[in-house]
Amino acid sequence: MTTEQGIVSLAGKVAVVTGAGSGIGAATATALAALGARVCCAGHNVENVERTAAEIRAAGGEAFGLRVDVASPEDNDEMVSETVARYGAVHIAHLNAGTGHWAGVLEYPLEEWDRTMAVNLRGVLLGLQAAGRAMRDVGGGSVVVTASAAGLTGGRMSSAYSASKHGVLGLVKSAALELGPIGIRVNAICPGFIASNDLMQQMGQELDLASRFPLRRPGRREEVADLVTFLASDRASFITGSVFTIDGGWLAGGIDLRDDSVDQATSDARVTALANTHSPNGDVRSPV
């Protein structure tokens, strides 16, 4: 709902957020709760999602943590059924969990390819199916999927991640066409480099990424959460099937992580090592 003053309110709404243990997911879960939603904080690391939920409760909100493997149909169904059992419905889903591995396309390990697709693409489909069925039961809802700027362009050493995020955008647009008539809106956000945790901030500093952005800084996870909460709310009631870039203007000039002080092979190796070091499995934001 929206207050008369135009301020977004999510009082009475129920949300599920995947990848809620840290980074963008934790920020979004916190922001949704601050606006009045009751939140299921889902993710692969139960300690992290329970910590996010505890912080929400300490601030006066309602939330619980749940371990969820987003690539598992059973886990997605449990996420939604447990949320409905506790709070009576699901109105909002932020499908945010993601992972990635950086390697050259000719040597890309198939097991890493399969894992990336399982989390980033299959996981979105399964979350959309489970949450969408619950939203259908209450007459509609809003699904917001975290894609990436890498879903709008290619990226060196990140073929699986980029391919998975391109696939996510196709899924979002197709789902919006199908689900619009039953009141379910589906949109995607495409973050650029977000300093979502200390390691990602360190990576940005090591690659001097701020100098590559028109705004001369990386994004903050709270800025992404603000976009998600808007799309989740009735303020965005006529928005569906859309893709929102939040990258500080990076894509306007083309993504390039190259270190110009060294040759291309050395630059690729450096970026790959940094990306894989700073991207723990399960709640990853790509450098692109």
Identify the residue ranges that each predicted region occupies:
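Active-site helix of classical SDR
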Residues: L128, S164, V172
